[in-house]
């Protein structure tokens, strides 16, 4: 208490007078307000709380989060799922337009603000639905002895009777008929083509027969075309999709395994976004920078006919193959004990013909956007997204996610209407069109709004579809790993069996099923491609979390992937049989992440972890890559020197990140003292948001993929589903090994320097002064 003079004391002897009582009341109110402020903790929101309450804002945050989770209902998810999967809805069709407006209607009814669509004019591909694709085998006399139907049969009429639903096709495959000998090339990756050549089998002028799995189908076809193939056939091996046997008791609809005439559909485009408008949005009023012929010439689109076949049709090919037996790791289970052969060609002079009927068309697609505007920082976006177009009905991919996202929106708005909670930052709901053709809707959106996103977007959280019922599975960048883990600890376990074993949260099962044993945490990978998070991270530098539920399996995805048997029956009776409890848990996790990013005072981004991962993981991997380069001692020293400089910059990042942690803690303290002065918070958050942007190279890191601009995490050139750590460096090493030259050697050093420059950018971003 400040010193009070004697005269003042004498003048204030009447302590019960009116003016003095008012003064004491004011002081007491101010003191109680201070206690309320001190209780604010690390969260802020638009909630109008009682400043005299003894309940802390952290308690209120947990209560609000639980309320949102409790408001997410399985019955609503089931309702939305049936609405969105009534008929086949391929991108660019009237049926998919109906789904877009059904989503907009659901979001509007829930109470989202400014729900609208964003159209783009893009190049899509369709089959001739009146003339199915086919595989034909003729004997040496030219007589037809086998012809595939090209159509999968209806198994559950109530859900699968849409016209043309069973058509078997692959988008962007070349139109035409080719006859040639067939060659088996396993999974169709780079090593498979290399090993086939070493075994003396030439692909040129042949039809390539390849198994799905362990890579993007478009990359398989791209490599086959590069090797000289004139056609390609893709099939799902029973070792992947029918592991318990192919009799009726062990496949759909009795189980989740693929039935004998099921096929995987998909896109063959080698790249993301509209193939005719790289770098720029495909708007009706804008010029297309590339022609169809140019897209085919540079490998973006295939020019050879390609079709998918069932394992039943594949057996007709495999049992006729001539040539030597395949290596043991190329052997599958089609035909039981059948030994796969390499070819080329069939025994007994039989011939193979494939007929593919396809057409390229420019069509209008439309994304759906809706908002919950933030009360404190409306210009900061927490973005949630899923695509809604499907190859057929899409009850798993993607509309399990579409239904869950609609319910998250509804539950959040219910919470807003029934409590005083409102997110501090804006939550943006996004439904993407034409993802299946090559992430087109999301890529065009990012290309159109990249400048806005780089200024306003905090994070993009993607959930494509539910792939299984065993465990949560998360891909994210190092700065967000901790928050992905922490959120899972707050979501109840959807499995009765898991709860009976003492694993009460989603995190507990995740740690059990997908452990990173050395790190003592669940396994988390860096995001690759294959879904709508990719353009946000790789093109715009917006940090992402991509998650789903899946089973522990060596196969890439679930057996019925992209088949016509993805209808609600599969979700409800085969995959998520406890009243869609897994779907609900996915929604709860999505909402928990969104609310955390929306309401944390200081954004939950950890640059210290990024620096640690760089030093402990990324740099050792890079060192191993450059150590294998066949160069002279002098040239290697030049590479080693630049690597050492990158290592030094990474150490600088670690030091600066730890120092910045102190700044973040000070900001927490300052906000708790005075929540009405947000200048410290804004300064810290601005720098945190900017760190991921440092890794965007405007010139790109891939000659083949215009959307690959992230120098750490861009999608692999060899597999569009996988990330490629420091892709620019890896591409430069590959170029040098293919064609050794001083120029290519210098490019390796240049690419290492480019990564170093990005690391230095992060260091400078975190500094208080330049």
UniProtKB/Swiss-Prot annotation:
Per its UniProt entry, which superkingdom is the organism in? Eukaryota
Q: Name one Pfam family in it.
A: PA
Amino-acid positions noted as binding Zn(2+) 1 in the UniProt annotation, renumbered to this chain: 387, 397, 464
Q: Which residues are glycosylated?
A: 175, 337, 417, 469, 551, 606, 630
Gene Ontology CC entries for this record: membrane
Q: Where is the active site?
A: 435 (nucleophile)
Task: Give the co-factor note.
Answer: Binds 2 Zn(2+) ions per subunit.
Q: Name one GO biological process term.
A: proteolysis
Which cofactors does the annotated protein need, by name?
A: Zn(2+)
The positions annotated for binding Zn(2+) 2 are 397, 436, 562
Q: Does the keyword Glycoprotein apply?
A: yes
- Keyword NADP attributed: no
Region Catalytic: start-end pairs: 282-597
Which sequence ranges are marked TM in the entry?
20-40
Q: Which reaction does it catalyse?
A: Release of an unsubstituted, C-terminal glutamyl residue, typically from Ac-Asp-Glu or folylpoly-gamma-glutamates
Molecular function per GO: carboxypeptidase activity; metal ion binding; metallocarboxypeptidase activity
Q: Could you identify this protein by its name?
A: Glutamate carboxypeptidase 2 homolog
């Amino acid at each position: 208490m400040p010193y009070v003079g004697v005269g003042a004391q004498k003048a204030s002897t009447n302590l019960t007078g009116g003016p003095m009582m008012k003064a004491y009341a004011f002081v007491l109110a101010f003191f109680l307000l201070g206690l309320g402020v001190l209780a604010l903790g690390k969260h802020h929101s638009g909630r109008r709380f009682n400043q005299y309450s003894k309940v802390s804002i952290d308690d209120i945050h947990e209560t609000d989060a639980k309320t949102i989770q409790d408001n997410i209902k399985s019955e609503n998810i089931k309702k939305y799922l049936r609405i969105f999967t009534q008929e086949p809805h391929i991108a660019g069709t009237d049926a998919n337009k109906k789904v877009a407006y059904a989503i907009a209607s659901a979001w509007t009814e829930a109470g989202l603000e400014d729900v609208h669509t964003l159209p783009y004019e893009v190049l899509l591909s369709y089959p001739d639905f009146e003339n199915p694709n086919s595989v034909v085998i003729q004997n040496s006399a030219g007589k037809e002895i086998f012809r595939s139907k090209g159509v999968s049969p209806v198994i559950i009429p109530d859900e699968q009777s849409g016209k043309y639903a069973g058509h078997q096709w692959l988008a962007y495959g070349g139109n035409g008929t080719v006859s040639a000998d067939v060659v088996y090339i396993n999974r169709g990756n780079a090593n498979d083509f290399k090993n086939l050549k070493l075994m003396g089998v030439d692909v040129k002028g042949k039809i390539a027969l390849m198994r799905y799995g362990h890579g993007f189908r478009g990359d398989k076809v791209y490599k086959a075309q590069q090797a000289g193939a004139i056609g390609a056939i893709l099939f799902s091996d029973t070792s992947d999709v029918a592991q318990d046997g192919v009799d009726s008791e062990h496949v759909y609809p009795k189980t989740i395994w693929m039935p004998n005439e099921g096929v995987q559909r998909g896109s063959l485009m080698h790249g993301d976004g509209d193939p005719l408008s790289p770098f720029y949005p495909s708007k009706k009023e804008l010029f297309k920078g590339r022609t169809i012929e140019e897209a085919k010439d540079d490998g973006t689109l295939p020019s050879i006919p390609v079709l998918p076949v069932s394992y039943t049709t594949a057996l007709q090919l495999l049992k006729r193959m001539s040539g030597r037996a395949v290596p043991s790791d190329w052997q599958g289970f089609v035909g039981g004990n059948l030994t796969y052969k390499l070819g080329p060609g069939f025994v007994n002079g039989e011939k193979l013909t494939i007929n593919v009927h396809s057409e390229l068309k420019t069509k209008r697609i439309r994304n759906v956007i809706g908002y919950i505007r933030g009360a404190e920082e409306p210009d900061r976006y927490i973005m949630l997204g899923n695509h809604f177009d499907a190859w057929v009905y899409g009850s798993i991919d993607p509309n399990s996610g579409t239904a869950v996202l609609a319910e998250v929106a509804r539950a959040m708005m219910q919470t807003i209407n029934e409590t005083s909670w409102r997110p501090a930052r804006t939550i943006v709901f996004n439904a993407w069109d034409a993802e299946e053709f090559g992430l087109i809707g999301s890529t065009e959106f990012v290309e159109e709004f990249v400048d806005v996103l780089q200024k306003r977007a905090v994070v993009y959280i993607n959930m494509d579809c539910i792939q299984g019922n065993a465990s949560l599975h998360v891909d994210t960048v190092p700065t967000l790993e901790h928050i992905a883990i922490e959120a899972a600890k707050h979501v109840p376990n959807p499995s009765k069996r898991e709860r009976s074993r003492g694993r009460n949260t989603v995190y507990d099962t995740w740690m059990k099923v997908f452990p990173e044993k050395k790190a003592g945490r669940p396994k988390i990978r860096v995001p690759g491609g294959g879904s709508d998070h990719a353009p946000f991270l790789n093109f715009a530098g917006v940090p992402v979390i991509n998650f789903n539920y899946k089973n522990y399996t060596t196969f890439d995805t679930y057996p019925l992937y992209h088949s016509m048997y993805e209808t609600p029956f599969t979700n409800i009776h085969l995959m998520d049989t406890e009243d869609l409890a897994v779907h609900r848990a996915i929604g709860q996790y999505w909402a928990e992440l969104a609310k955390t990013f929306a309401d944390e005072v200081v954004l939950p981004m950890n640059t210290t972890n990024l620096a640690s991962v760089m030093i402990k993981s990324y740099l050792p991997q890079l060192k191993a890559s450059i150590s294998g380069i066949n160069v002279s001692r002098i040239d290697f020293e030049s590479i080693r020197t630049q690597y050492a400089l990158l290592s030094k910059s990474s150490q600088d990042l670690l030091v600066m990140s730890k120092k910045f942690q102190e700044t973040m803690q000070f900001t927490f303290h300052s906000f708790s003292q005075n929540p009405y002065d947000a200048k410290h918070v804004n300064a810290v958050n601005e720098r945190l948001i900017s760190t991921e942007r440092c890794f965007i190279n405007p010139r790109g890191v891939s000659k083949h993929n215009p959307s690959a601009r992230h120098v750490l995490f861009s999608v692999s050139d060899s597999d569009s589903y996988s990330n490629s750590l420091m892709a620019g460096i890896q591409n430069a090493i590959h170029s040098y090994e293919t064609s050794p030259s001083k120029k290519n050697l210098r490019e390796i050093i240049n690419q290492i320097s480019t990564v170093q420059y990005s690391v230095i950018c992060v260091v400078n971003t975190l500094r208080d002064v330049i």
